[in-house]
Amino acid sequence: RKNSHEQILSAFSDGEADILVGTQMIVKGHDFPDVTLVGVLAADMSLYASDYTAAEKTFQLLCQAAGRAGRGKNPGEVVIQTYAPDNYSIIAASHQDYDEFFEQEIVYRKLMGYPPVANMVSVLLQCSGESELEMATESVVQLIRKVKEQKYNELFVIGPADPPVSKINDIYRKIIYLKS
């Protein structure tokens, strides 16, 4: 229902509800001083996204969730359920240690040549027809190859490939990554 999440958050904030169950959305931008316990289920799910920033996003989300507990007079507690308790982003988030996370993440980024140690651009192509998308993708790939040969030999091309969600609302999608 329209505005239902605002009503639920308001009821929780006003003390009309003692337990709030929600998605990632509730950890951002809300201040509930009486919250003393935060539980995060399947905290490692975002680690498996096909995105080089997956560990960073997991770390951020867990730190934001942990920041919801103990904001008022009473101390807070955070319980994290995970299938990857040895993952560096989970460990660093459990300590809320940004330096610990960065030290591990920057090693990974350097090894893989990902930002901030390299430049990276994603080119998302979308068309209503699958055959049109294939033709457009081939044209873009040829253009990229031509530019690479003429000016940017150090350019590394990944793809084209299907993105994690390759069709949305009858729109077909392809993605190409460029690294330098």
List each language-model region with its residue ranges:
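Short, intrinsically disordered, charge-balanced linker/junction segments flanking boundaries
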Residues: 178-180
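Nucleotide-binding motor/catalytic cores of P-loop/tubulin-like NTPases across gene-expression machines
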Residues: 151, 167-172
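Inter-lobe coupling/hinge segments of SF2-like helicase ATPases
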Residues: 1-134, 138, 142-146, 164-166, ...
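Short beta-strand elements
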Residues: 147-163
